[in-house]
Amino acid sequence: MSPKTLYDKIWDAHLAHEAEDGTCLLYIDRHLVHEVTSPQAFEGLRMAGRKVRAPEKTIAVPDHNVPTTEGREDPAQMTEESRIQVQALDKNAREFGVHYYPVDDIRQGIVHIVGPEQGWTLPGMTVVCGDSHTATHGAFGALAHGIGTSEVEHVLATQTLIQKKSKNMKVEITGKLNPGVTAKDITLAVIGATGTAGGTGYVIEYCGEAIRDLSMEGRMTVCNMAIEGGARAGLIAPDQTTFDYVKGRPHAPKGAQWEAALAWWKTLYSDDGAHFDKIVTLKGEEIEPVVTWGTSPEDVLPITGVVPSPEDFTGGKVEAARRSIEYMGLTPGQKLTDIEIDTVFIGSCTNGRIEDLRAVAEVVKGKKIKSGLRAMVVPGSGLVRAQAEEEGIADILKDAGFEWRLAGCSMCLAMNPDQLAPGERCAATSNRNFEGRQGYKGRTHLVSPAMAAAAALTGKLTDVRELI
């Protein structure tokens, strides 16, 4: 038998049928749904008189539209469109009998944080959701990716998905990271090196010493942004770090089932000699804290750098750089550390976990944020929020001047009350920085939680290494 990659193994284990043209039917182990991409899918089932094929494998949670301020159960806090979507999910989840975490449940939060937290995400699984950042779950050695609304309906009805197999890509991060450099810096550095189309047509497996050294939360951050690199999905082979994280979670296997699952999970790695169609290698010790300067996740530079000139680019990227610089209100040659900000947003499915909040608290403890700055911390779930309060993190953040919010997607995207005003500049721990992502004419700089904390203290983009 020829050597297989991790992706090959998971794909083959879930392949139900393959047509002559390479179109395949895959079995889906977990289907996560939220309020934005599911209403039409459930309505399609209703009109066809169909049931959800596997409600026990379907998990619903509202996250994109929900307000993050107290009293958010009041429908008046939402726009009409948001209210309709949240209420539709509530109705559909109850009617079709899927697992459901409503707004008033402490387990509610961002779907890609709730899934792993509750033990729904396990190694070797296929996981889909009508959301591009489903790649997050690949940190567990699961094949996880986003799907469209018509596909959401197909999975609800059949527990299968039609697709063609992607190619294999390996991204290796060798060596050790230096102090102040985090998983967010890794994933941004990779996108900066490969571009937003570098992974197009591929499933990425992340490996190397720097990846193995990451916690599960760090690995989720890395895989979360595989889609920003153009990939279909991102994977990290499971190991003892993975098993320790999963064990004991509410929906993880127990007893003999755990032992049986563990035996299989330990086979989930790329065999020696397995073929990768593309290989990218970065040296971990050479990665610095980074920040995006433009309107694409590939517009990445070390915090020690300067805003580039359009003439630094070639081809179509010259005009793209010119437009980005103009939109962002920057000047070529300007030091990144001279860029003043108005807002700091810490949260999202990229960086809304307890480890992220600990990193922020470590930087700001005993200090105050810049006067006049708006800074908010939005935990990724109600359980993350409760844990942060129990550990004293919430008090540290509030004492420093941060707004302490309820769980949700919040300012990651302009679909709820948390938005930037036109021209407002934000240091954000989220995953996308295109025009208008956080609000009409808002300006976004993507950074790690530690870097966002540093920016909150100084009022400008700052090298966190100077503060730790």
From Swiss-Prot:
CDD domains according to UniProt: IPMI
Function: Catalyzes the isomerization between 2-isopropylmalate and 3-isopropylmalate, via the formation of 2-isopropylmaleate.
Pathway it works in: Amino-acid biosynthesis; L-leucine biosynthesis; L-leucine from 3-methyl-2-oxobutanoate: step 2/4
GO MF: 3-isopropylmalate dehydratase activity; 4 iron, 4 sulfur cluster binding; metal ion binding
Name recorded for this polypeptide: 3-isopropylmalate dehydratase large subunit
UniProt keyword terms in alphabetical order: 4Fe-4S, Amino-acid biosynthesis, Branched-chain amino acid biosynthesis, Iron, Iron-sulfur, Leucine biosynthesis, Lyase, Metal-binding
InterPro entries reported for this sequence: 3-IsopropMal_deHydase_lsu, Acnase/IPM_dHydase_lsu_aba_1/3, Acoase/IPM_deHydtase_lsu_aba, Aconitase_4Fe-4S_BS, Aconitase_4Fe-4S_dom, IPM_dehydratase_rel_enz, IPMI_cat
Gene: leuC
Chain positions recorded as [4Fe-4S] cluster binding sites: C349, C409, C412
Note describing how the cofactor binds: Binds 1 [4Fe-4S] cluster per subunit.
Pfam annotation, one family: Aconitase
Species this chain originates from: Ruegeria pomeroyi (strain ATCC 700808 / DSM 15171 / DSS-3) (Silicibacter pomeroyi)
